Amino acid sequence: VKTVAISQRVDAYPDRGEVRDALDQKLANLISMAGFLPLPVPNEIAMCKRSDAKELSGLKVWLSEIKPNVILLSGGNNVGDCKPRDATETGLCEFAELNRLPVLGICRGMQMMGVLDGGTMTSVEGHVLSQHKLSGEIVGTVNSYHDYSLAECPKSYRPLAFSEDGELEAMRHCQLPWEGWMWHPEREDEFQARDIDRMRELFKS
């Protein structure tokens, strides 16, 4: 079974003195239903140096030991709001590029992929708690939960889908098996065959 390393959102609880990594259980369920093994990635290890690993960060040590087959950048948090998470996802993308692993970015995950490629973010209206009809290579109706979008398709990617108001909703890397989706496939009442089939195709590439 192929393993999928999944980045996690960061939630702070100052009254308890805790900062927690969090992952929607439905996302792990979706990955399992698609036939893969989900492996959540701890965020703070990206900021730590292992005393027994010289210059390697804790994330690099984790990746070298776990050896995931696929990287998934999940939703939640805004890009730039949480340094440990940004560092984790930057390291995951570097590892994926070096090893030519498939990457799927969901919502914030797609935004992070775009920003790492030199893209910029812009605020949008009407994209929170709404539905959009897609046009392009991917069609259908999808959910929407984001306040920001990529201002344009990053240079290393090609667009796969747009919303009715012209915002980029999906993209594919021109050289690597990487895709970004702005919708949340895990938040559907029933998982969509379209999303599961596309996930399987991407993860097996």
Regions found by a protein language model. Give the residues of each.
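N-terminal beta1-alpha1 cap of cysteine-dependent amidohydrolase-like domains
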Residues: 1-108, 115-116, 122, 127-135, ...
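Catalytic His-Asp charge-relay segment
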Residues: 177-181
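DNA-recognition element of transcription regulators
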Residues: 144-148
